[in-house]
Amino acid sequence: MDTNNLSLAASTWGFFFNREPETWLTIPQAIGELTSLGFGVEVWTNRGWDEAWLNRELVQEIVEACAGVSHISVHTRPEHWQWDPHGLSDEVEFCSMIGASALILHPNSLGLDGPSPRPDFPGIKRLAAQARARGVQLVLENTRDTMWALDLALDEIGDDPQKTNLGICIDVGHAYISQDAGREPIRNYLERYKGQLVHLHLHDNFGDADEHLPLGDGSIDWQDLADTLKAIDYRGPAVLELQRQGDLLAAFIDARDYLRSLGL
């Protein structure tokens, strides 16, 4: 793989998580901060956990902020971290409005959770068909210890994203804290789903908690990650999902420089 083949984006989430509400930017302002540095964006449509769905005026402001952005994805809202076909349908429509190519879903968004999951696979297929018609791909993200959920979805829906409109996002930080993928969980997650891999989430931790640290502040072996991505020839979007109480933009810039130094 040649250098600079990751399409780097950054998440708006870091501007709001664990920060005092009086310091929050608007969502369009957060998008503007990221795009001014040349990043694509992953849009979260909520700032606090309980923030209401977007009004028409705010949607239009987000549309304008996203105009001309290299890569746009949307992360599902917390209230849709359970199976809610109507709510997810609204998120698909929002993706289409702002030009987002992907809607990122946790397994529980598709009913893939609990001790005896019974997902509505026909409903998921209908949602995927709706998304395809809007130019949006559904992308299933691993959370902690969810290899079983990704496998089940691919077994039931199909493992060819071109046919199913369901791809996989490997969240490197989530893989690192997982106990279901052996001693090299990041490498094993990436290699297992390389045929469905259409998206990455990048952040660091120490292998025990989902801290979303800047790259290099935890214990993830980023050189090994780079080698694995080159080996599987991944050439797609990678979203920096970072939190920092200080200068968040500096963390994004440092992460980009570090990844480029690794040939990504």
Model-derived regions, located:
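N-terminal pre-domain/capping segments
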Residues: 1-96, 101, 264
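Hydrophobic faces of well-ordered beta-strands that scaffold small-molecule active sites
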Residues: 6-13, 39-43, 70-76, 103-105, ...
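Active-site beta-loop-alpha junctions enriched in small/polar residues
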Residues: 11-18, 44-48, 75-79, 108-110, ...
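Distinct, well-ordered alpha-helical segments
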Residues: 20-27, 52-63, 83-92, 114-125, ...
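Acidic/histidine-rich catalytic cores of soluble enzymes
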Residues: 41, 71, 128-219
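Alpha-helix-loop-beta-strand connector modules within alpha/beta enzyme cores
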Residues: 59-75, 124-134, 222-225
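Short, electropositive alpha-helical surface patch
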Residues: 69-70, 95, 155-159, 223-228, ...
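Active-site groove signature of glycoside hydrolases
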Residues: 98-115
